[in-house]
Amino acid sequence: MFILPGCKSVCRALQKAHAQRLLAGFVAGLGALPTVGSEPLYVKNLSPVAGLIGLPSQRDAQITPSGDWVVALHGSLANHYVNDGNATEALNFDGETGRVALELRYGLAENWDLQLEVPWLDQSGGDLDGLIDDWHDFWGMSDGGRSSVPKDVLDYRYASAQGDFSLQDDTSAIGDVSLSLSHAFYRDENSTVSAALGYKFGTGDDKDFLGSGADDAYIALRFSGEQLSDLPLSWHGQVGYLRAGDSDVLDGLQEKNLWFAGLAMDWRFTRNWSVIGQIDSHAAPLDSELTGVGGDAILGTLGTRWYFAPQWSVDISVVEDIRVETAPDVTFQASVRYRPASGG
């Protein structure tokens, strides 16, 4: 077959140009993906006692449009180590908590939505102790004595004159199911304020540390808004009150009236990616002089969100106990969320 001189080089150039056009079209297509609205990171304090209480995670104040669904799946893995005591109390938390939660929201009517959350919990010795010890050693950080105890062992214990509890055997099952009703009562071009009423049912086994064994109720006020400047920032916050029910496992120890609050900032640095920083805090779950159960908790979270497809996003985040011992040493979290584009 006869080929004109220079034809091969021309064909290669045409093929290269075609490939470049395809790549450019693919990248442009990614940039054109419709993305959904901003949302705080899903954060729960999974400390063995605080995790039993029905404290709600932050969510945006925007309400799901009438007739629409928002669906999310959240996964968390928390590692605990606290060993503390005084003349009248002794506390030991050593283990890991795994939690997977299905979250469903449904738009009941204009400015009203209903949210259902169904969690599955696992309490065990886990597998992260060695990794965390190596991390502390690498950075020369204090480990609070965790390297001197056996690794990957489950041992939750508390004892005082007022009561005691313990868990040494691995457990896993459904946790406490929660239901909440939210109403947006203020809205303008850049912000929304909503109120929520929530109820946590004592469906988890309290003796296995899968729930409190009691019903809790809360009220929350939430806001969401865009930064009033050219910066691509969104802000979210919540403040609320929870009334805890009578828990058999915490009998004689628990605090019944708990406040909670949180603030999140979402920086959308590209159309399909954002970085989120978040603070969450709540009142101590027990009447105790020991920080691990009697101190007000402060958690800090840093995460990233990828809007990988129309109406879909995935979050990856790490939670640290800013106030040491009031939350797990570290919690690794991931969420996948579907939210209709009309959801804001």
Segments and roles (model prediction):
Residues 37-245, 254-343:
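Transmembrane beta-barrel domains of Gram-negative outer membranes and organellar outer membranes
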Residues 1-47, 342-344:
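Cleavable N-terminal export/targeting peptides
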